[in-house]
């Protein structure tokens, strides 16, 4: 694996592991049923995220108005959050399943953004500009260089370096933050903020249009389910030996906020689908050609 050096045949570092294939494939030591449930929920969440984008791809091809239905700021905020999440997952030494999910996020977002610009430029070709190319180039560069960030061994940070910062200080039962993990924690926090902010432009776009036509509800429904399972998979995982539960939650806090924190905003979007459903039905009936008498 690129992001974590593992010796598949060496199970000695996980003496209490109950299922060896989990260690071999994911590098996670499943010591009991909670750890096994964590892995299972994480896998299901990945399938939810993987399936969520396909209905939107199909919807975009059918309606051809994806550039009107989805807010560009929503897509940019989403892909910005996923890019930060990917970098932060490597630097903060997150669970392998978190890293796998982050990689898929970025790839799916790139395809979604490509479809958006395809329909945008199809209608107005002259809008293609250098800033958009720069954004796509930055995202592509992020995907390419992120695996290289994990090749550097973390350097332990002396306790004096965090004097006055109680959350990141080293206390009994706490796993100390390394310099690389601190950077990853900050980037992960930025990704959580971008996730939260990305929903606001889409909520506004739906409100201004008084419609959710052109958007597949399956996109948000499956993302909500995936985020719920993803957050639960992190919460069910046992802390490392000698690490307190508080320290474990602190290390994973940005990713918990990024997954569970957006559920409220996605619920608002779900309500918009219900409220504007009748409007969309009326608009669709008006566009239907009259049957010949």
From Swiss-Prot:
It is a multi-pass membrane protein. Pfam families: PQ-loop. Keywords: Amino-acid transport, Glycoprotein, Lysosome, Membrane, Repeat, Transmembrane, Transmembrane helix, Transport. Residues 1-37, 93-96, 148-182, 236-254 are lumenal. The chain crosses the membrane at residues 38-58, 72-92, 97-117, 127-147, 183-203, 215-235, 255-275. It is found in: Lysosome membrane. This is Lysosomal amino acid transporter 1 homolog.
